[in-house]
Amino acid sequence: MTGALPDGADRRRAAYRFGHRAEWLALAALMLKGYWPIGRRVSVAGGEIDLVVRRWNTVVFVEVKARAKRDDAREAIDGAKRRRFSRAVRAWIGRNAWCAGATFRADAVFVGHWAWPAHVERVFTIEGL
């Protein structure tokens, strides 16, 4: 049987590809600002961290949000997302003893179609640190 996938599957696949490209764009933007990548799509017991980067003695955990309009992406980080993100960060820190003396920060990069990624530092406080 051949043919196109159902509309829902097409939309999910397109959204996945858009999110994947957004993460690469976000990483490129951060590297241009002097951040060095440590991990991408890091899976830990608490969840997933889109990007982990480092600049000097600061380890930055980055949530990448991609929407058609960049301003819509800012609204996508709610309380539940913050709790899951914080849980994942704590699990990551527990597995990486080398960063014991580092400063930690939670940033976000918002990506929209045809717009340069917007990097927002300290988008929220990491719970439990």
UniProtKB/Swiss-Prot annotation:
Q: Which InterPro entries match?
A: Restrct_endonuc-II-like, tRNA_endonuc-like_dom_sf, UPF0102_YraN-like
Q: Give any GO molecular function from the UniProt entry.
A: nucleic acid binding
Return the Pfam families for the record.
UPF0102 (PF02021)
Family under the similarity heading = Belongs to the UPF0102 family.
Q: What is this protein called?
A: UPF0102 protein Mrad2831_2938
> What organism is recorded for this protein?
Methylobacterium radiotolerans (strain ATCC 27329 / DSM 1819 / JCM 2831 / NBRC 15690 / NCIMB 10815 / 0-1)
